[in-house]
Amino acid sequence: MTDYKATLNLPETAFPMKAGLPQREPETLKFWNDIGLYQKLRAIGGDRPKFVLHDGPPYANGSIHIGHAVNKILKDIIVRSKTLAGYDAPYVPGWDCHGLPIEHKVETTHGKNLPADKTRELCREYAAEQIEGQKADFIRLGVLGEWDNPYKTMNFANEANEIRALAEMVKQDFVFKGLKPVNWCFDCGSALAEAEVEYADKKSPTIDVGFPVADADKLAAAFGLAALDKPAQIVIWTTTPWTIPANQALNVHPEIDYALVDAGDRYLVLAEALVESCLARYQREGKVVATAKGEALELINFRHPFYERLSPVYLADYVALDAGTGIVHSSPAYGEDDFYTCKRYGMSNDDILSPVQSNGVYVDSLPFFGGQFIWKANPNVVAKLEEVGSLLAHETINHSYMHCWRHKTPLIYRATAQWFVGMDKQPRQGASLRERALEAITQTEFVPGWGQARLHGMIAGRPDWCISRQRNWGVPIPFFLHKASGELHPRTVELMEEVAQRVEKEGIEAWFKLDAAELLGEEAAQYEKINDTLDVWFDSGTTHWHVLRGSHRIGHASGPVADLYLEGSDQHRGWFHSSLLTGCAIDNHAPYRQLLTHGFTVDESGRKMSKSLGNTVVPQTVIDTLGADILRLWVASTDYSGEIAVSQQILQRSADAYRRIRNTTRFLLSNLNGFDPATDLLPPQEMLALDRWAVDRALLLQREIEEAYREYRFWNVYSKVHNFCVQELGGFYLDIIKDRQYTTGANSVARRSCQTALFHIAEALVRWIAPILAFTAEEVWKFLPGERAESVMLATWYDGLNELPADVTLNRQYWEQVMAVKAAVNKELENQRAAKAVGGNLQAEVTLYAEDALQAQLAKLGNELRFVLITSTATLAPLSAAPADAVDSEVAGLKLKVVKSTHAKCGRCWHHREDVGQHAAHPDLCGRCIENIEGSGEVRHYA
């Protein structure tokens, strides 16, 4: 048999079948760097509309984890897709550099007794070192950005502009000093932000404590009695015995019914609804003597169990009946509700008792417990209560309790003098900060939508923002307080600008080493220089000011507003939250137009990632084994609005999907062998009907893909691209065109039409995948024929796809019908192959028995129907002529019969045709192949 291989147009490409991503991706990174891709995008972006995704800064501490990878990849997909959509989409990565975790690391390494200036120096060095490590990992993920000039909250310019942002808020009268209970960590020795608090189970003692009545006559009258004939106690229940020494009041709900219970040796005051459960807990018998509403008990005095002072009853709406006794003991220094209730009843700051020091130890002067650590003092307080006859019950419970996110140790509320941003404080002009923020939320688009209600609820219910910290490594609050009056210097805003100018040159050290006389002159002796630092959430929360408006100036002309903030869902109480407050305080609007949140990573069983469970996935390991593009494809394929499942098995499935997409692109490239779009591209009207349909299908898909990118539905992009490769291309079009592509004349219309379609599809496909498979798209781009920009990212969505007019005979609906018929034929061919009735599809001859309308439709393809069905023969017949052994199909009005061909196989096209062997010069070829080799070539019209 003659070898006819040389007469075929076989696929050929240097594009590798094996991806080798771990080895090839670094070469692409070098290419992007060598051509200055990010800088070129900025250069061509001047006339484009701007899209600003402002980076929420990760903390400059430790290696990146899988959550970091998810976040940065999502951001990069958006930036790349916006670039392809014709936007100028700068991406300035940033880092959060100040704060306790870094200071804690330095103290752990170098000891706690370092001079403050040395601590700051080492913190700055440590943060810089951590940033370099994280930066390398983010770049390796393929994230395109201004890596040579990222923003860092510790950059001198950023530190200075943060002070200026604070000055703006001072100018508008949002900032004040106050004594309030704040989240306090003994290990940190500082207040904590709400976002630095996490909850964990804690075992705590619970005690029921009786406070003896001091105003017995008033108590009797409240219950409608003439007098009390025995001692009486009002009973509280608490899980914090250590707060009893600081008790200053008792709270009841005005509308709850309270009972005076005769418990034998004394009367007990309890919520009526809880009498039965309380008596059972006390192992006592008792009888309700009288009842009264809580409001009747207001201002009745009781005595502290072991100190010579009174505890009056105050009314409070937060008292509930879900546990305890229905009466709450109030220590205003150690509880927010307690504090506000006592203040409402006229208690001054000087009257508030605060015996617990910053390290958790009682002051030495506290009777009975001085010098004791509060957690260790709990049993001693219980013993004292038992000694004085006030302990009615003592148990232990496990409950959810607030802990420090860094030290994992329990926190307390502790009233300290701190600097606050007032939520309801009336500014010099306009609405309160709470009102501004709640209004701004209504102007913000949330993705997913439930984020709006979540953030609204947090803002509506949050207390004033405590912005001061008692640490070394942080941006200073550069205030001077008058020693006599405690008031801020009258030139505070002006002085803050002078400090900012110094910080811009020397960093935060400029404030800490500053002699007050340098700024205040002779006034210095009258003022105290404050050394508090700003909450790190103020650092990151003002990046819209000191980055978009300041160091990088990438905001819109209208001001430092980002189009999008994108972070994990925990940032509703973190960066989204603090940015909203600072934006509304300074500019009276949110610093973002859209908020997008993603969930957290879990394993395939829905469990959180944990080293102890052994279910963590390290991004660096995935990159080194599978490649960054596999990680990117996994991120894109997941609905990130909920929990994001990841495991080795899930990543392997992503790798399998990647292979299908890569193989499809390789098929396209290999069949563009010998194609030059400058000379070989056909106009739509000269293309075959099937090829026009394929280009039209790509156009429809591109519209859907562009919309999915606009709406951040990357999982839809993935599924549409993957399905297109598997179904419309792999399962239909590409199989059909192989015969025409390989066997017709190299420069025939039939082949050039096919190549034109493949070229258009490849041009579109490489762009569709570019935001997700960043490395692979760049690799594909280099192998596409024709002149083009250096990088796919310097292009925009492909505009060469042509729509198939609705009025053509073989329109979209026609090919949908043909696809259904082909699927039915394929199913029967599979059955026949399984039964070993036929070998390959080309060994089969199929007869389609169709009702008249369907037969007429299929007849439009003429002799080319067999090429669509990929059988050696395809015959049409009336449905009424179907023999008994014809097979029903899922297509209405269609039956099938497949038989094995009795004809010889063509040695070139492999079709079984009756004219094989009829040509003496080529005894093993069919007439069609002889025409393609020696004649003017076959003519195709449809497929």
Curated annotation (Swiss-Prot):
GO terms for molecular function: aminoacyl-tRNA deacylase activity; ATP binding; isoleucine-tRNA ligase activity; tRNA binding; zinc ion binding. ATP binds at residue 611. Zn(2+) binds at residues 906, 909, 926, 929. A motif ('HIGH' region) lies at residues 58-68. GO terms for cellular component: cytosol. Monomer. One of its GO terms (biological process) is isoleucyl-tRNA aminoacylation. Catalyzes the attachment of isoleucine to tRNA(Ile). As IleRS can inadvertently accommodate and process structurally similar amino acids such as valine, to avoid such errors it has two additional distinct tRNA(Ile)-dependent editing activities. One activity is designated as 'pretransfer' editing and involves the hydrolysis of activated Val-AMP. The other activity is designated 'posttransfer' editing and involves deacylation of mischarged Val-tRNA(Ile). It is found in: Cytoplasm. Its EC number is 6.1.1.5. Its main location: cytoplasm. PROSITE patterns: AA_TRNA_LIGASE_I. Its cofactor is Zn(2+). A motif ('KMSKS' region) lies at residues 608-612. Binds 1 zinc ion per subunit. Belongs to the class-I aminoacyl-tRNA synthetase family. IleS type 1 subfamily. It comes from Pseudomonas aeruginosa (strain ATCC 15692 / DSM 22644 / CIP 104116 / JCM 14847 / LMG 12228 / 1C / PRS 101 / PAO1). This is Isoleucine--tRNA ligase. It holds the Pfam family tRNA-synt_1. Keywords: Aminoacyl-tRNA synthetase, ATP-binding, Cytoplasm, Ligase, Metal-binding, Nucleotide-binding, Protein biosynthesis, Zinc. The lineage of its organism: Bacteria, Pseudomonadati, Pseudomonadota, Gammaproteobacteria, Pseudomonadales. It comes from the Bacteria. It catalyses: tRNA(Ile) + L-isoleucine + ATP = L-isoleucyl-tRNA(Ile) + AMP + diphosphate. L-isoleucyl-5'-AMP binds at residue 567. IleRS has two distinct active sites: one for aminoacylation and one for editing. The misactivated valine is translocated from the active site to the editing site, which sterically excludes the correctly activated isoleucine. The single editing site contains two valyl binding pockets, one specific for each substrate (Val-AMP or Val-tRNA(Ile)).
